[in-house]
Design a protein with these regions (language model features):
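Beta-strand elements of repeat-based all-beta scaffolds
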Residues: 2-6, 13-16, 25-27, 32-45, ...
Length: 456
């Protein structure tokens, strides 16, 4: 079993396991994941360790299918590693139908609780087993566990009151969503969807008409037409007696070759015509509009990424890539004309966990360094700057303000940017700087207070 993962930049993920206790429903023991702990990062950026633990109950093995159907309940504990490894929150996922062949992997409810058991959020799911239209042979029938209803709730931690949104779905004989209704206090929203049916080509999932309404009033209505291959050739946006119509044509590979937009007050219609490459038939090489303007793109054959783009004014942009497919240079029209090797150049230093960007400037290039921690998170940037000091301009490195996070990835403190000697621009700065603000959260992850450096 996998016990640990070492990330490319040096961070670690450690996984622990334990065995379940045998029971009648689950004879024998099973190894289950008991905890996951991630370590890494810089201490000055806050928490360097996060941890979740897991508990399982209600495991079931079907004796007829000779297969394990999963646990009825899984609890995930969120541990506050910055506060003595105390329990902060926990969530419970329930698989209430884990004794059925078709539904044993479906969540029937999930709730988030505070450490002392007060509900924060919840969702309840109900499913309907539908037999899809596959012919008259019942032995070949396909059963689809369709989500029939979903009720999502947010709870007030203090009073226990809740605000809920209920969603109900209906489906057609092919399992397509046909009706959607969202209901909450004093509000409801409905969507009804129909589909094209090209049975001989098994195309039954392309919407033909959709209506969105509330309280008997239609707020959005769309309809489509398709060709014999199921490709949408027309989209109509119903706007009373003045519908907006889009038309599309396709090539033999299914690419859009022409898209025509709705007409204006003079009955004129804008269109865009697309041309594709001759090798892959998927890369757009030119675009032409109704005015005769055109733009084009040439591609790097190794990465299928743009190498030269030409806009409608004939101005070019050039792009190059390194041996790993990463952006290496970008050259804009002015630099192409003046013969400069780049407008922007990118350099990568994974061993030092940093990237370097150089912006060309006649007055001197602008360097930008981005530093990552061992968990591969960007934590600091530095940029060339000029400040007035001692009666003259001084070239410095401007260090981004530090963001400090807690054990759950929330920003709890922010610090102002600072300057340093330009000679240190390529080295990570461990200094913290001046405090800007501290932020506190509730167990819903909502901001409850922001305190500035002066205490206000």
């Amino acid at each position: 079993m996998l016990r640990s993962v070492t990330l490319p930049f040096g961070g670690h993920i450690n996984i622990n396991y334990e065995q379940t206790t045998p029971s009648y429903d689950l004879p024998g023991r099973r190894w289950v994941m008991s905890s996951v702990e991630t370590t890494g990062g810089y201490k000055e950026n806050g928490a360097i360790r996060s941890r979740n633990t897991f508990e399982y109950s209600g495991g079931y093995r079907d004796r007829r299918e000779r297969d394990f159907y999963g646990f009825k309940q899984v609890r995930t504990n969120q541990i506050d590693t910055e506060n003595g490894d105390r329990l902060y929150r926990y969530s419970v996922q329930t698989y209430g139908k884990n004794r059925d062949y078709y539904t044993h992997g479906l969540v029937t409810s999930e709730y988030l609780y505070t450490a002392d058991g007060k509900k924060l959020q919840g969702a309840v799911y109900d499913y309907d087993l539908k037999t899809l239209a596959v012919g008259h042979n019942t032995a070949d029938a396909v059963v689809f566990p369709a989500l029939k209803t979903l009720v999502q709730s947010n709870f007030d931690e203090a009073g226990g009151d809740s605000l809920s949104v209920a969603v109900s779905n209906t489906y057609d004989d092919y399992g397509n969503l046909q009706g959607y209704k969202e209901t909450t206090t004093g509000y409801s929203l409905e969507a009804n969807i129909n589909y094209h049916k090209i049975a001989d080509k098994y195309i039954v999932g392309v919407p033909s008409h959709i209506t969105v309404s509330s309280g008997g009033k239609t707020y959005r209505e769309r309809s489509t037409k398709v060709d014999g291959n199921g490709e949408i050739t027309e989209i109509m946006l119903h706007n009373g007696d003045k519908p907006s119509v889009y038309n599309m044509t396709y090539d033999g590979y299914g690419n859009i070759t022409r898209m025509t937009k709705p007409e204006n007050y003079n009955h004129q219609r804008m269109f865009y015509a697309y041309t594709y490459d001759d090798r892959y038939h998927s890369l757009v090489t030119s675009v032409k509009d109704a005015y005769g303007y055109s733009s084009s793109t040439a591609y790097d054959g190794l990465w299928n990424a743009p190498s030269v783009t030409t806009d409608l004014n004939g101005q070019k942009m050039e792009y190059t890539y390194d041996a790993l497919g990463r952006q290496m240079t970008i050259r804009a029209p002015y630099e192409i004309e003046s013969g400069q090797p780049f407008t922007i150049r990118y350099e990568y230093f994974p061993a030092e966990r940093k990237a370097h960007t150089i912006h060309y400037s006649k007055e001197g290039n602008i360097d930008t360094y981005t530093f990552a921690d061992s968990l591969m998170r960007a934590v600091q940037t530095k940029q060339t700057g000029v400040v007035w000091s001692g009666g003259s301009n001084q070239k410095v490195s401007i260090v981004s303000g530090r963001a400090v996070i807690d054990a759950f990835g929330r920003n709890i403190a922010a610090y102002y940017p600072m300057t340093e000697s330009h000679g240190n621009i390529g080295t990570y700065n461990h200094a913290t700087g001046d405090l800007q603000a501290k932020t506190e959260y509730d167990t819903h992850d909502r901001t409850t207070s922001v305190t500035l450096a002066d205490g206000s």
